[in-house]
Design a protein with these regions (language model features):
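Acidic, low-complexity, intrinsically disordered interaction modules
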Residues: 38, 45-83, 88
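Short intrinsically disordered terminal tails
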Residues: 1-2, 47, 100-103
């Protein structure tokens, strides 16, 4: 069960990172450095990541109290498609958009 606690701790760390990313995104949006469509798209990706990590935590807690199995956790994690807005390519696109707006 120690590994389940480690998974919970790690996921909560990433939930905090998602919240920080959301704050940074809101800040650059409020400064007028990205448009509304880009902001909404990136915000949805961050929220999706945050919800994914929270789902993993919920499954882990259910495993600890005996309501779920590790197989459910394995299947959930196995089927995750990572679509982070923080990938290098997408981050470069945001920076390019900011630079274009400054011209």
């Amino acid at each position: 069960m120690l590994y389940i606690q480690h998974i919970i701790t790690t996921c909560m760390y990433y939930v905090k990172l998602c919240k920080k990313q959301n704050e940074k995104l809101l800040k650059i949006y409020n400064l007028g450095q990205i448009n509304t469509k880009t902001y909404e798209y990136k915000r949805q990706l961050i929220m999706s990541d945050e919800n994914m990590f929270l789902d993993i935590v919920k499954i882990c807690i259910c495993i600890l109290i005996g309501k779920d199995s590790t197989e459910k956790l394995y299947n959930y994690i196995k089927n995750i498609e990572f679509k982070r807005w923080t990938t290098t390519k997408e981050f470069k696109e945001i920076l390019e958009e900011i630079q274009l707006r400054k011209r």
